[in-house]
């Protein structure tokens, strides 16, 4: 982990940073998300299938990952980018770090690039094909792979993310969730 990693866009724009996920090569449509929190939900949101998601908030990973906050059974995005991955996870519900989660789920991820510059480029040009790599660091090879990667336009991604069978949601609220809202009523006043 923390080996060199590279993002190259189909137009040849290059960003070099550090790996915070699995080793390998991943292609996808590079997009951004402006949420300050919820990175775990973004990782497991099926609507990000085939996309490399860039987080605009500067530090990601500070509350770790837990099995209660997933949107689906596994991550669906192609890759993940952030400015800085927090080395400290501070949440009593956390079961693993963001880096551990990305690695164990085979997600190629990158930190340490100028995400503001990348987001500005995407905002002006629109989403574009890109490639994340920790193994092939040859610019020419990566640009060609990004340009020749399959487009998401017209692709039936629903079939790729749909579970094979329906699941029943019958869990109760976690023990830390307040069961009674009577304490809120004490602050209510009668205005009539």
Protein language model regions, located:
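Residue-level preference for short coil/turn positions at secondary-structure junctions
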Residues: 1-3, 48-49, 76, 177-180
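Acidic, glycine-enriched active-site microenvironments
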Residues: 2-11, 15-16
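Structural beta-strand/beta-sheet cores of well-ordered domains, especially the beta-sheet scaffolds
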Residues: 3-5, 28, 78, 157-159
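Feature captures the catalytic cores and cofactor-binding loops of soluble hydro-lyases/lyases
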Residues: 13-141
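Secondary-structure junction/capping motif
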Residues: 93-97, 175, 189
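Flexible inter-domain linker/hinge segments
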Residues: 122, 136-181
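Conserved small/polar residues in nucleotide/adenosyl-binding loops
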Residues: 182-189
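Acidic-leg catalytic submotif of subtilisin-like serine proteases
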Residues: 192
